[in-house]
């Protein structure tokens, strides 16, 4: 009888050990799932307005967006610019390209003057930008 009791106790201990191992496995799996979801959440950072806009621009427009960012200097002004309608931004960047393309040869120093003109023109908003922001390169 004692042997049966001892064997029965050993059987229960083994059975209990198997159940606790299953619990550890399920806890480990749930931890792995939780870790994966946390990694995915950190990887999916929302894109900035600038990044979203850059995806929709061609290479020339991206180049002139960089030029404009440098010209505005102030992040607040640039962020205000990014808040405008996409089509207006694209037309403004195309206008900047055409004006800068005319500043070649002897007129290269006029590019810096054009930066100041652009800064002042954008203070009044993007509407009418093409009329108010013109370089002196075409006039000379």
Swiss-Prot record:
Keywords: Cell outer membrane, Lipoprotein, Membrane, Palmitate, Plasmid, Signal. It comes from the Bacteria. This is Lipoprotein MlpD. Residues 33-53 have a biased composition (Basic and acidic residues). It is a lipid-anchor. Induction: Weakly induced when grown at 35 degrees Celsius. An outer membrane protein that may participate in pathogenesis. Some human Lyme disease patients have antibodies against this protein. The Mlp proteins probably undergo intragenic recombination, generating new alleles. A lipid is attached at residue 18 (N-palmitoyl cysteine). A lipid is attached at residue 18 (S-diacylglycerol cysteine). It comes from Borreliella burgdorferi (strain ATCC 35210 / DSM 4680 / CIP 102532 / B31) (Borrelia burgdorferi). It is found in: Cell outer membrane. Residues 22-53 are annotated as: Disordered. Coiled coil: none annotated. The keyword Lyase does not apply. The keyword Transmembrane does not apply. GO terms for cellular component: cell outer membrane. InterPro entries: Mlp. Belongs to the Multicopy lipoprotein (Mlp) family. Residues 1-17 form the signal peptide.
């Amino acid at each position: 009888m004692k042997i049966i009791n001892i064997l029965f106790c050993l059987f229960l201990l083994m059975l209990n050990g198997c159940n606790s191992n299953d619990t550890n496995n399920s806890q480990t799996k749930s931890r792995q799932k939780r870790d994966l979801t946390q990694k995915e959440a950190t990887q999916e950072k929302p894109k900035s307005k600038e990044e979203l806009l850059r995806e929709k621009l061609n290479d020339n427009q991206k180049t002139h967006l960089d030029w404009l960012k440098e010209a505005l200097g102030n992040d607040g002004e640039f962020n205000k610019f990014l808040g405008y309608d996409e089509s207006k931004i694209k037309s403004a960047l195309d206008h900047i390209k055409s004006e800068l393309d005319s500043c070649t040869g002897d007129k290269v120093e006029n590019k810096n003057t054009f930066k100041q003109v652009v800064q002042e023109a954008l203070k009044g908003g993007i509407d009418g930008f093409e009329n108010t922001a013109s370089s002196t390169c075409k006039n000379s």
